[in-house]
């Protein structure tokens, strides 16, 4: 097998020749199995039971986004008012989920839906969904200045 001296010189030059050097540290792997077992033990202490026939779950956030769980596992302990949702959430906009979430919307989210419908009818792209919230919502909250107590602010 013939050896090309140019390629050999190039490879030797590219190879890092270090004697001694620093040790390459292995990255610590965060194991979630331990966290999962702790969670399972905590739910076991609360006597949580698996809730069947839950196909999906949606959590509406204050910023107008929705955490959507397509396949979700739900465990609940009604006595301690504790419920655990397990699965992989996807962050989506309300506009992406409108056909699926109409039956799930409560009274607090109907205002957001109305604003969204108005924006779509006006031909505008949906902007921030909470933009229509009352701007003066903090009228009764006084501004604090450094060194003052909240009771003394007029």
UniProtKB/Swiss-Prot annotation:
Keywords: Cytoplasm, Nucleus, Protein transport, Repressor, Transcription, Transcription regulation, Transport. It comes from the Eukaryota. Residues 125-154 are annotated as: Disordered. Disulfide bonds: none annotated. Its main location: cytoplasm. Residues 33-98 form the NAC-A/B domain. SMART domains: NAC. GO terms for biological process: protein transport. Coiled coil: none annotated. GO terms for cellular component: cytoplasm; nucleus. It is found in: Cytoplasm; Nucleus. It holds the Pfam family NAC. Gene3D superfamilies: Nascent polypeptide-associated complex domain. Belongs to the NAC-beta family. Component of the nascent polypeptide-associated complex (NAC), a dynamic component of the ribosomal exit tunnel, protecting the emerging polypeptides from interaction with other cytoplasmic proteins to ensure appropriate nascent protein targeting. The NAC complex also promotes mitochondrial protein import by enhancing productive ribosome interactions with the outer mitochondrial membrane and blocks the inappropriate interaction of ribosomes translating non-secretory nascent polypeptides with translocation sites in the membrane of the endoplasmic reticulum. Part of the nascent polypeptide-associated complex (NAC), consisting of EGD2 and EGD1. NAC associates with ribosomes via EGD1. This is Nascent polypeptide-associated complex subunit beta. The lineage of its organism: Eukaryota, Fungi, Dikarya, Ascomycota, Saccharomycotina.
